[in-house]
């Protein structure tokens, strides 16, 4: 049997990491957080554990939350910590990845007298939070130390640990822990445990072994469920083996399990990724025939596939259907549909989609606004783009990306006065321009023959500490060349070098340009080399 192939590994009482929950480190680590006076005012005259839990939970500052906890235990007359107060502070600290005080407090909890009776939920929370921080080894140590606190480990903590190991891609350890669960930990796996093992095997692309686990589950007195089958089906889909995935679907049906929206969506996603869109559409038809409602993920998979296939009309129709069913599409999906419509020269339809989203209380964000502004400007409809921007600005704060997109469109159309007004609006909103913002403005000025003003903008760019790049210098050099003022190029180089704002690519541009023109006697290379030597 597959499940018995791994030799049982003894997990002895944990002695390898005595630093974890070490009492010797506890006092010193927490001393810096202790205060003689109440850390917050007003401090309650009467304090009960429930009130303290509320104070800790509501406190946004992690250090202050810990100070409140310590002051209550050491300085408030008659107050004694209990399991709930420890749980609240340990959860808050571990969630914020403040692990040093966590380990010190755990040492205090373990050594408390009289002993504080703990529950398993505390350890489950710690397992999760250490795992989310990528510290799966610490999660394993915590799991092994649970009995030290007078708590019996259950299948819940085992399943939490297995999930942590999967999140951290330690699939080999999942099988080892599963195999040793009963003998070393006294825990009998349940179907959720088996599903986690199946998931780990599928993640490491060992679907054949996952299938063997599926076959052996009944011998453990358990019944494979929909999640078991869907996980294996997803494994085949990830491999691109759609025929095997279909066989799993048929086996599910034969054994009396009816696929849900997730199962169908996984199958559809596999077909879409392989470009087999018609088969994905057939799966969606089957789904509806079986009276299974698609969810937001189902719609997302199909809409993205339609956009990729350049079928903007069908994507728009499905998007409308999604909104009608009260599903809220995410920003990236909206941008996909807007892009597909605009690439198909349906900018008006894209604007209509924007208005429909507003009507459905689905507030567009900066990414979506920037996408639509980009296409409106590309079509030469800068005035409409500005109106859209103003409409958005009434209820939201435009991002730098949104400002950059509209400024670029205005500069491209030669509407420099409007671009300047928008620039001023940026400053009023304390939205700091970046190299791209300066580049589009400099390019707009240069294209309109106002290179002198472009150089002034470069000076401002250098003054605020924004690094020009190769593109910035190319724009100005080309502008000077058109005006027959190439001799002024060295002044720009000197200005940049004096401010220490020249990157490697820009230096290469300078050397290539000026070394190539040395023989013409236009720009002396010696000047450039001198600038480099003194910078």
Swiss-Prot record:
Alphabetized UniProt keyword annotations: Mitochondrion, Repeat, Transit peptide
Cross-referenced PROSITE patterns: PPR
Range of the transit peptide: 1-28
PPR repeat positions: 82-112, 119-153, 154-189, 190-224, 225-259, 260-294, 295-329, 330-364, 365-395, 399-433, 434-468, 469-503
Keyword match Cell inner membrane: no
Pfam hit, one: PPR_2
Protein's UniProt keywords contain Repeat: yes
CC per GO annotation: mitochondrion
InterPro entries from the UniProt entry: Mito_RNA-Proc/Resp (IPR051240), Pentatricopeptide_rpt (IPR002885), TPR-like_helical_dom_sf (IPR011990)
Homology family: Belongs to the PPR family. P subfamily.
Protein name listed in UniProt: Pentatricopeptide repeat-containing protein At5g16420, mitochondrial
Lineage per the UniProt record: Eukaryota, Viridiplantae, Streptophyta, Embryophyta, Tracheophyta
